[in-house]
Amino acid sequence: MIYLHNKRKGMLKRLSALIVIGLLMNLPAVFASGGEHAEAAHGDAAHAEAAHGGGAHHDPEKLDAIHHVIDGHEFDFEPFGIVHLPKIEVGGFDISLTRHVVMMWIAAAILLLIMFGVGNQYKKMTKNQAPKGMANLMEVLVDFIRLDVAKQNIGHGYERFMPFLLTIFFFILVCNLIGLVPYSATATGNINVTATLAIFTFLVTQASAIRAHGIGGFLAHLTGGTHPLMWIIMVPVEFIGLFTKPFALTVRLFANMTAGHIVIISLLGLIFVFKTYMIAPVSVAFALFIYLLEILVAFLQAYIFTLLSALFIGMAVAHEDHGDEAHGHAPSH
């Protein structure tokens, strides 16, 4: 027990050290941006000279928090340089790569490597062997989604939705985590990405409802079981309600993942707002706290998105027994 306790303490220390190093690696880019920003504000003459290409190459947007979270066609590795992504145009449509697209590809590649690695490890295991390392972690997460999310909220027949729920959970989780790596970008901080994920949940939900109840049952749900005279009110309300769920999923994930990064950049930017490094220890300390909180938020938001998706699917496929069988209770007659 003492060995395990010391081992866990050692792992926590190493993890904390990596987080601090990652945060400090972001500082050169912010310091470099702040230095250029200060030179630009040195005087009107210097500002005019910079505007006409007189040698300074500052960008006032460098200290703008929004500039650091929006999508773009380049990766800014200040003070080392900028990597521009290739421009692609097909049939008059601009399908050029962006930071968030690249980060989604990286997230997908990481997931494939992890899943294939864990799968190969399970193939080599005997019945009496317990999974170790990454396989053990993945088993815990998969069982958590299966038992506490899918089975709890969908009930009977939850197994067929497991591939979808596991996919969105791990994809959102990996996108959230790699967004904390210095010089990277958070794809889930893009409302187009979160909207696409929410649309997939919407399509799965409605298709499952039609499959469970048929077209007639699906349309009857829009009336809310009310008197025909009330349909003029109930149908629009229920129809709008169909779209409020994916809208809530979209905005919730987008806002939470964007807010944390803006807070970190803003705290570090206070160093240059006050134009003194005396404020640096306070800013870095608060930024480090938010950075640690963002790790928790990365897991929490992936869980909430998956939980709400399972809840919406469960509500859509619930039968006339009101889900009693799904929750292990005998239906009343």
Swiss-Prot record:
It comes from the Bacteria. One of its GO terms (molecular function) is proton-transporting ATP synthase activity, rotational mechanism. The keyword Transmembrane helix applies. GO terms for cellular component: plasma membrane; proton-transporting ATP synthase complex. It is found in: Cell inner membrane. PROSITE patterns: ATPASE_A. Its main location: membrane. It holds the Pfam family ATP-synt_A. Residues 1-32 form the signal peptide. The chain crosses the membrane at residues 100-120, 161-181, 185-205, 229-249, 254-274, 279-299, 300-320. It is a multi-pass membrane protein. Keywords: ATP synthesis, Cell inner membrane, Cell membrane, CF(0), Hydrogen ion transport, Ion transport, Membrane, Signal, Transmembrane, Transmembrane helix, Transport. HAMAP family: ATP_synth_a_bact (MF_01393). NCBIfam families: ATP_synt_6_or_A, PRK13419.1. Key component of the proton channel; it plays a direct role in the translocation of protons across the membrane. F-type ATPases have 2 components, CF(1) - the catalytic core - and CF(0) - the membrane proton channel. CF(1) has five subunits: alpha(3), beta(3), gamma(1), delta(1), epsilon(1). CF(0) has four main subunits: a, b, b' and c. Belongs to the ATPase A chain family. This is ATP synthase subunit a.
